[in-house]
Amino acid sequence: MALTCTDMSDAVAGSDAEGLTADAIVVGAGLAGLVAACELADRGLRVLILDQENRANVGGQAFWSFGGLFLVNSPEQRRLGIRDSHELALQDWLGTAAFDRPEDYWPEQWAHAYVDFAAGEKRSWLRARGLKIFPLVGWAERGGYDAQGHGNSVPRFHITWGTGPALVDIFVRQLRDRPTVRFAHRHQVDKLIVEGNAVTGVRGTVLEPSDEPRGAPSSRKSVGKFEFRASAVIVASGGIGGNHELVRKNWPRRMGRIPKQLLSGVPAHVDGRMIGIAQKAGAAVINPDRMWHYTEGITNYDPIWPRHGIRIIPGPSSLWLDAAGKRLPVPLFPGFDTLGTLEYITKSGHDYTWFVLNAKIIEKEFALSGQEQNPDLTGRRLGQLLRSRAHAGPPGPVQAFIDRGVDCVHANSLRELVAAMNELPDVVPLDYETVAAAVTARDREVVNKYSKDGQITAIRAARRYRGDRFGRVVAPHRLTDPKAGPLIAVKLHILTRKTLGGIETDLDARVLKADGTPLAGLYAAGEVAGFGGGGVHGYRALEGTFLGGCIFSGRAAGRGAAEDIR
């Protein structure tokens, strides 16, 4: 599905757009900005949406996404025998977030409000606008600690039928043909205009036209300047994941050394510029050291943006080894604790790890994040989806990474596999005996129906959930079983993705100053605001919460701005 929004009217580029009036300006045409614009337009207000990229990039990172949504006690869960509740979800959220700072007051208020939304009207509100949900519910971030610690106690990851593009299209369709909504692409905001202690507009640079495809780097050559005025400005410009300089600048000391090698899970235009611009205008920025970067990144053999990486969404069965060939500690199993794994890796002195698995595991347990890596789900082709899951071998996109990727090796014996791993570039040579000891010890634990090995126990527990048993988790077996071969190893990189801190706001998305009072006329939503309040997730996330955070905070910003304008 191509979402180019070619039928949506643009503000006239360059000096002809000078002085265009609007009730509200939205900076950023990603999901949060689109939702905010819909709320404003529904209330009869004139909206101008500015974005530094071309119209091909409408929808921002949501377009590239898997379309996962965090829902609580949904019909999809109940059909699968999952007993969820608001109370359990809030327990999981707060245990995961671990709020512990004075500046976490508003983020925690947002957390309570968001769980209310996810357990309440979120599903019905989205379905009324056209959302369709895939019937199997995924179980992300399983935790592995105690009941009050990190992780989802039950599966809550609901996949949009049509993935990210279908979710974006819900709001694009609402804005299409609305005469009160205008887009100004290739308009890069450089400054928020502050007059009389209030934000009254924006100034910036008109960039030269670009016909680059979605996600590809575009020119920053200036062809003019602009200034627009409005009663409200909503910043919905995204995070810092494409700006490795900012990622490194804000890297938390508690996470160990700053990685030297990073892949990018987002395009270069996810640059975090507006965070600093808002701060210069008086906005409080909190929790800049909280980030969400994935540890299962692989190099894209067909990159769209610089250092383009793809995340593996793994099932729980792969053996996870560090760069020295030692098994990661409990409970750092695939899909259990992203941040805990990241901290272990950075403190290990290396920037990569290994999955060791076999053909049987990769066939069922490897999914690649992103709509372009899931053409059956994205294209809403049920027949193709069923065929791809029923036939022997991994899904086509996974097989393509095995065949063409630079991070995968396979062999018929473990000794041959370790030799192949050692041939990959930029690796510390692995000792065969160290790897063999980890594999052999793990394989001994699957002989019985019970085990002291925490990962094997977790795999068996996961298979008691119908969704995992049917489509996600293989039965425990020896990695070295010839019938399950060949053996496979995947070199995993750290992949930048989400900004968890950001511009501080109240529950109406009003931007706050350092003294805690609102900066009149300014609102923030989406990743630039830490998905709500300056960090609704705290230190960690439960997954399916980023798109939902953009929707919830974008809705709050649109409604809050409309109320104040009226």
Swiss-Prot record:
GO terms for biological process: lipid catabolic process; steroid biosynthetic process. GO terms for molecular function: steroid dehydrogenase activity, acting on the CH-CH group of donors. Coiled coil: none annotated. GO terms for cellular component: plasma membrane. The keyword Oxidoreductase applies. Belongs to the FAD-dependent oxidoreductase 2 family. Pathway: Lipid metabolism; steroid biosynthesis. Its EC number is 1.3.99.-. FAD binds at residues 23-54. Its cofactor is FAD. This is KsdD-like steroid dehydrogenase Rv0785. Keywords: FAD, Flavoprotein, Lipid degradation, Lipid metabolism, Oxidoreductase, Steroid metabolism.
